[in-house]
């Protein structure tokens, strides 16, 4: 192989690696949120429902808005996209 061909192949591999790394880093830290309607929001039930529905690492359930009666709250699931 000539010097130019080797250099071209090296540059193409380098650029593809840089693009892959930047895309992976860009989308790996995003957090998604989904509301689940509940008749009576309880934190343990909310965590369990979120964990079974979204089987991912870092799933957390929270009853929102805080300070309201459980009947008026909804379950907010947060997880890594």
Curated annotation (Swiss-Prot):
What are the record's GO terms for cellular component?
extracellular region
Kindly state which keywords UniProt assigns to this record, in alphabetical order: Antimicrobial, Disulfide bond, Fungicide, Plant defense, Secreted, Signal
Q: Which residues form a coiled coil?
A: none
Pfam families found in the cross-reference section: SLR1-BP
| Biological process (GO), any one | defense response to fungus
Q: Which cysteines are joined by disulfide bonds?
A: 32-81, 41-63, 46-75, 50-77
> Major location, coarse class?
secreted
This protein's source sits in the domain of life called Eukaryota
The record's subcellular locations are:
Secreted
Question: In the record, which residues are listed under signal peptide?
Answer: 1-21
Q: Which family does it belong to?
A: Belongs to the DEFL family.
**What name does this protein carry?**
Defensin-like protein 130
What is the species of this protein?
Arabidopsis thaliana (Mouse-ear cress)
Gene encoding it? LCR28
């Amino acid at each position: 192989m000539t010097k130019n061909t080797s250099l071209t192949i090296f540059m193409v591999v380098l650029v593809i690696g840089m693009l892959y790394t930047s895309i992976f880093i860009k989308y790996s830290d995003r957090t998604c949120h989904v509301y689940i309607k509940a008749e009576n929001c309880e934190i343990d039930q909310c965590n369990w429902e979120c964990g079974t529905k979204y089987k991912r690492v870092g799933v957390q359930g929270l009853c929102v808005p805080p300070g309201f009666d459980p009947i008026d709250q909804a379950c907010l699931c947060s997880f890594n996209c």
